[in-house]
Amino acid sequence: MSDTDNSAEMPARCPSPNPAPGAKQEPPNSGITISLLEIGSLPTVCYHSFPPPKNSICPVEKRGRVQKFSNLLKDVKDVLKNIAGVEEKSTVGEPFDDAYIPEDLSELNVRGVEKKNKIRFKDDLFIHFDPEREQNTMKQMLLKNQSAKNMVPKFARDLCNAEETRGFDGMLLSVKRPRNGSLHLRGEYRKLRNNMEQLLQEADHWSKQHNELSELMRSYQECQNETQETTDKDRACLQNQPNNGLSTKQKLEEQVKKLSHDTHALHLIAALLENECQVLQQRVDILKDFHLHEAGLGHEKPLQMSCEQDKKCPKLAEADKTDAFKHTTRATEGTIRKPKILRSPDVCFTKKARNNRFNARVAKKSLVGKRRTVSSFR
């Protein structure tokens, strides 16, 4: 009766949760069921610690135990199906707000996501399952219940409870995991986006600094070119200054030479003018003496004397007449016309020579006239 009661209590304690209506029914994963059975199975220590079965156990009890284990397996399969459906809902129904999901997702990508979720569920089961803790609990229960009859149903009950709690924990984890994963991914995506924004800001800042540096380099090059041009101009000016000084000195020397030449010419002209003045004064004096002499003496005697002398020396007479004629004409020209100023020194010298010759002739004539007067008085 106890076995039947236990068999009646087992399905009541292990109700399988109803699957979601929109969940996609998939064949159970054999790897997951085997792993669960291996986890839920008793360790070798427990089997060795069991007392040997008695012959008094009926085959009815064996059948009941087989049915219990089959029921447990069915419940585990249903739990796994429900967990897979919940995971699919969580992955498909909760899209990321910040992430961009393209519309043309293929079925291969969906299947890959489902496989990843199943692998994640396996990992969660293996990670969160603590075999040492369960072994300790089982050992304590085995020590408390030493009877072989009550050990199997109690172990079945504990196993059922453990499977139920494990299934519900797995469901909660599978429900919470995508949410936590989505939050984690959102946080990482936000961090990446913030990092990208910071990098873009830094790139803008660096580009601005690069532009400023390029402008500074251009201004610096322009300043260098200007300073180089000014230095070249200064050097050219310094090199040209001695040449300019020499050219100015040469110009001044040439001007001094011209001035000295002009002063020398002026001095010559002044000397010639003074000489001409003296000559003119002499001429004036001679003419006065000649007029006085002509007025005081008769015309006949001097003419006779002159005729005799002319006969004696006809050549001298003709020369004297020509000289007298020239003297009279020049005297009249000197009184009427102004004396010409000769610019060239050669002309001045020739004129001076002519004047000297004229003066010599006038002096000779004056001497000849005096001699004639003396001879006539005798």
Curated annotation (Swiss-Prot):
Its main location: cytoplasm. Keywords: Coiled coil, Cytoplasm, DNA-binding, Nucleus, Phosphoprotein, Proto-oncogene, Transcription, Transcription regulation. Disulfide bonds: none annotated. Residues 116-122 are annotated as: Interaction with PPP1CC isoform gamma-2. InterPro entries: Spz1 (IPR042961). Expressed specifically in the testis and epidydimis. In the testis expressed in both germ cells and somatic cells (Sertoli and Leydig cells). Expressed in several tumor cell lines. One of its GO terms (cellular component) is cytoplasm. The modification Phosphoserine is found at residues 106, 207. The keyword Transcription applies. It is found in: Cytoplasm; Nucleus. GO terms for molecular function: DNA-binding transcription factor activity; DNA-binding transcription factor activity, RNA polymerase II-specific; E-box binding. Induction: Down-regulated by testosterone and retinoic acid. GO terms for biological process: positive regulation of transcription by RNA polymerase II. Residues 182-233 form a coiled coil. Phosphorylated by MAPK1/ERK2 and MAPK3/ERK1. Residues 252-273 are annotated as: Leucine-zipper. Residues 116-127 are annotated as: Helix-loop-helix motif. Transcription factor that binds to the DNA sequence 5'-CANNTG-3'(E box) and the G-box motif. Directly binds to a guanine-rich region of the PCNA promoter and up-regulates its expression which in turn induces cell transformation and tumor formation. May play an important role in the regulation of cell proliferation and differentiation during spermatogenesis. The helix-loop-helix and basic motifs form a Spz1 specific bHLH different from the classical one. This is Spermatogenic leucine zipper protein 1. It comes from Mus musculus (Mouse).
